[in-house]
Design a protein with these regions (language model features):
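Short pre-catalytic strand/loop immediately N-terminal to key active-site residues, enriched for Gly-Thr
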Residues: 4, 164-169, 225-227
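NAD(P)+-binding Rossmann beta1-loop-alpha1 motif at the extreme N-terminus of oxidoreductases
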Residues: 1-59, 64, 127, 190-192
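Small-residue helix-packing motif on alpha-helices
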Residues: 30, 40, 57, 195-203, ...
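A structural micro-motif
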Residues: 2, 28, 48-49, 90-91, ...
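Rossmann-like NAD(P)(H) cofactor-binding subdomain of soluble oxidoreductases
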Residues: 54, 58-132
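Glycine/serine-rich anion-binding loops at beta->alpha junctions
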Residues: 118-123, 168-178
Length: 230
C-alpha cells in the first residue's frame, strides 16, 4: 500500500481515515495537514502523521510511494489552502462541496488529475453513499483508487459530473429531510404520551426496518405505502 495525503482533517476526512484504518490501511501511510492544533491532536491519536503545513505534507508524500491526495477542506478556504502548492504526480480527490472539476482545475497545476466526490453525513458512521466523477485526465487506476478511499465511508456510485448537482440535492441534502421526518414522528409519539427515549427508539427502528425492506425486497416505495394504508 502506498501513502495517502489529506489536505484538511475535519469530520469527513477523519471518518475516511477511520474507515481506512478499520480496513487495515497502515496508519503510518496516512498523512494529514490541518492548521487547527486540536484537529491535529485528534488525528495524532489515530497514529497517522499530522502536519500543520499543506506543502510540508505534500513534500513528505512526494518522497514516498504515494497513491493520491484527498482535498477535504471547507469551500470558503479552498483557494487559500491550494495557493502556491506544488503537488506530486498523483490524483487529487476532492470532497469539497460546490466545487466543479473545472473550478478545481483553475486552482491546481495543469498536470493534476482531478476527481470530484459528494459524500453525505451518514458517511460519518460508515453508512453513507458517495457520488464520484472523474476528470478527463483520469485513468481507470485513478478512479479505482478513489473508489477504494471513498468506500471507507459506505457505498460509492459513479455519475457524470453534469448530474452532481442533482446528487447533491438528493443524497447530499436528503439526510436532513429524513432527520426532520423522524423528529416529527418522535414529537408525535411524545404528544401521544410516550416517553421521548421510547418514542425515539420506535421511530428510528421503524425507519431502519422500512429502509431494510426497500433494500432487500426491491419493490417500489409506493407499493409499501399502499400496503400500510390498506
Amino acid at each position: 500500500m502506498g501513502s495517502i495525503g489529506f489536505i484538511g482533517g475535519g469530520l469527513m476526512a477523519t471518518a475516511m481515515i477511520k474507515g481506512l484504518l478499520q480496513q487495515g490501511y497502515p496508519a503510518t501511510e496516512i498523512l494529514v495537514s490541518d492548521p487547527d492544533p486540536k484537529r491535529r491532536e485528534i488525528l495524532g491519536a489515530l497514529h497517522v502523521l499530522p502536519f500543520q503545513d499543506n506543502q510540508e505534507m505534500l513534500w513528505e508524500l512526494g518522497k514516498r510511494e504515494g497513491e493520491g491526495v484527498v482535498l477535504a477542506v471547507k469551500p470558503q478556504v479552498v483557494k487559500e489552502a491550494l495557493a502556491g502548492l506544488t503537488f506530486p504526480f498523483l490524483p487529487v480527490l476532492s470532497i469539497v462541496a460546490g466545487y466543479s472539476l473545472a473550478a478545481l482545475a483553475r486552482l491546481l497545476p495543469a498536470e493534476v488529475r482531478i476527481l470530484r466526490a459528494m459524500p453525505n453525513t451518514p458517511a460519518l458512521v460508515g453508512a453513507g453513499i458517495t457520488a464520484l466523477s472523474a476528470g478527463a485526465k483520469c485513468g481507470e487506476a485513478d478512479q479505482k483508487w478513489a473508489e477504494k478511499v471513498l468506500g471507507s465511508l459506505g457505498k460509492v456510485v459513479i455519475v457524470p459530473e453534469r448530474l452532481m448537482n442533482a446528487v447533491t440535492g438528493l443524497s447530499g441534502s436528503g439526510p436532513g429531510f429524513v432527520y426532520f421526518l423522524l423528529e416529527a414522528l418522535i414529537d408525535g409519539g411524545v404528544l401521544a404520551g410516550l416517553p421521548r427515549p421510547l418514542a425515539r427508539e420506535l421511530a428510528v427502528q421503524t425507519a431502519a426496518g422500512s429502509i431494510k425492506m426497500l433494500q432487500e425486497l426491491q419493490e417500489h416505495t409506493v407499493d409499501y405505502a399502499r400496503q400500510e394504508l390498506a
